[in-house]
Amino acid sequence: MGPSSRDGKAGIGRANRPKKERSRRRRGGRNRDPIAQSFQITDEYPNGVFLTSIDVFFQSKDESIPVTLQIRPVETGLPGSTIIPFGEVILDPDEVNISQDASIPTKFTFDAPLYLPGDNNRFAIVLISNSLNYNAWISRMGEVDISTAGLPDEQQVLISQQPYLGSLFKSQNGATWDPSQFEDLKFTIFQAEFNTDTSGVARFFSPQLQ
């Protein structure tokens, strides 16, 4: 499924400094400037998966404006406009964790397990906010893993391959998407596990009618 990024795979923006991407939405207007990350439900899960939550890693946040995560289908290679049922979570700033080394996750938990069919279907994680102050950690090919940026040069880890099947997308209006093939959002997907070794019991009764 390609569900998670490698730990600390945040790119470096300039002169060995952390690289971050902004998830934003224009205040008071319909146009949105989100970012999105595609992922694939591989043939390892032919019957699909039930997502329970997603961890995203933020470098900064707003003091009063929330941030929204959505799950959308990928259509013709780009994030679609529809939201998977129950696939939207809104977090207030006090629910968002930030870190300067991409080490502390922020968990977006769905109200109900979110079913995504298998057969190599692709979906997108979309981050939107009315604030310009949200910055999410990403990786960039050829740059240094932020978790090793403070180590001597010979101990630093270079990002030499993408950690999963997918691509980062950027948008100026929420409708037109531009892929960034060498960048990826840092995230972790959690799925439900069901115990099929036990039998369920359902009890029905009919009330006595007068």
Residue ranges and their predicted role:
Residues 1, 47-61, 123-127, 183, ...:
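A short beta-strand element within beta-rich, extracytoplasmic domains
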Residues 32, 44-53, 62-64, 118-122, ...:
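Extended extracellular/luminal ectodomain segments enriched in beta-structured repeat modules
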Residues 23, 27, 31, 35, ...:
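Threonine/glycine-rich low-complexity segments that form extended coil/beta-edge repetitive scaffolds
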Residues 28-45, 104-110, 185-188:
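Short beta-strands within extracellular/lumenal beta-sheet-rich domains
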Residues 1, 117-119, 127-209:
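Short, surface-exposed beta-strand/loop patches at domain edges
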Residues 42, 57-59, 111, 128-130, ...:
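Solvent-exposed residues in well-ordered beta-strands and their adjoining turns
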Residues 2-29:
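N-terminal leader/pro-regions and domain N-caps
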Residues 1, 62-159:
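Aromatic- and Gly/Pro-enriched, solvent-exposed loop/edge beta-strand patches characteristic
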